[in-house]
């Protein structure tokens, strides 16, 4: 991991002297991006970065953990246990123009930072998002591994599920297999839905039992070295279900069409609109209005790394981006189908990871 290269990407176009990242009960993903730390929680820790180096302000609790992982360009200071030492360490921001992540920083932490008298506090969340859009070879390798673990886990569980199992049992199996294959955790809580529940895109697994002929939807993602996968599979369990099988076949074809359209220079937002129009017009409109979410999103340190397919500043596709592509159709009272894969944008188009 080249710390200085990542700092150059963040500071490019940002009119700031220093970057300040403040973790809360969870880590700001940009803390992970700049440190590469894969162990430790670093709750309420600070990161202060110049254009050349990163300083982590931590406590006795995390000091050795941070020190053992610090690469070239990263300094670690054990100062959070002492008000005097902390004030001395953070005094570097006094009179300086400070960039912060406005998408993560709490109002209380913003006010705490103001007390140390920076000349300006500027929200550079767009710079941070932009810096992380195009992935390095190391990042791509981590995402590829996370995807591989996720796909294998879903396949293994699909072979072992039986009628009478609950959604919660299947979700637990998926999580167990991913961990046993080396995942450090989940990108998000695993979604498992049976039957009518598959019509709810973000259904959380419950005690619903699997019946013969049910639609089964599994949406999950392993995390590997901080990097996420996001994969969804929908299938019919047991006896044939013609309507459900036709829906699955259609959604798979739509996903292939969408992936084929993703190339450097293409507007992802327009691709999403074209896909929606196609779904709405298919066979006289039998699926009209049933595609109720975006075509996909960025994937990386977060399961939803950036709204590439939305009407956002990040919609122009670039080589090196990693994206999740997830068309779906949903019928309340019957069920839904979503197929999701993660792709890497190469110079010639999208490669399914």
Predicted regions and their residues:
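Active-site neighborhoods and metal-handling regions in enzymes and metal-associated proteins
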Residues: 1-353
């Amino acid at each position: 991991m080249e710390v200085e290269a990542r700092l150059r990407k963040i500071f490019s176009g940002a009119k700031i002297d220093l970057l300040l990242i403040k973790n809360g009960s969870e880590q700001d993903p940009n803390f992970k991006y700049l440190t590469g730390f894969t162990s430790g929680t670093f709750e309420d820790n600070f990161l202060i970065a110049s254009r050349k180096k990163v300083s982590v302000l931590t406590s006795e609790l995390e000091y050795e953990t941070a020190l053992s992982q610090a690469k070239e360009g990263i300094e670690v200071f054990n100062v959070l246990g002492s008000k005097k030492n902390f004030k001395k360490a953070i005094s570097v921001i006094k009179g300086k123009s400070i960039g912060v992540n406005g998408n993560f920083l709490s109002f209380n932490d913003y006010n705490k930072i103001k007390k140390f008298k920076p000349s300006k506090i500027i929200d550079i969340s767009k710079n941070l998002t932009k810096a992380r859009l195009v992935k390095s070879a190391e990042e791509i390798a981590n995402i590829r591994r996370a995807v591989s673990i996720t796909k294998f886990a879903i396949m293994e569980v699909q072979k072992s599920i039986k009628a009478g199992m609950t959604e919660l049992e299947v979700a637990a199996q998926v999580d167990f297999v991913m961990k046993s294959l080396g995942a450090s955790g989940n990108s998000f809580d695993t979604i498992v839905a049976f039957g009518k529940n598959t019509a709810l895109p973000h259904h959380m697994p419950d005690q619903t039992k699997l019946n013969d002929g049910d639609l089964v939807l599994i949406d999950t993602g392993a995390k590997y070295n901080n990097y996420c996968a996001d994969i969804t599979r929908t299938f019919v369990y047991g006896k044939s279900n013609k309507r459900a099988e036709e829906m699955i076949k259609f959604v798979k074809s739509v996903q292939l069409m969408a992936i084929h359209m993703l190339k450097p220079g293409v507007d992802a937002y327009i691709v999403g609109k074209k896909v929606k129009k196609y779904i709405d017009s298919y066979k006289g409109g039998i699926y009209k209005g049933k595609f109720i979410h975006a075509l996909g999103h960025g994937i990386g340190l977060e399961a939803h790394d950036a709204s590439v397919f939305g009407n956002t500043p990040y919609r122009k596709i670039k080589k090196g981006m990693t994206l999740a592509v997830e068309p779906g159709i949903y019928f309340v009272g019957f069920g839904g189908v979503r197929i999701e894969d993660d792709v890497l944008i190469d110079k010639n188009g999208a490669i399914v990871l």
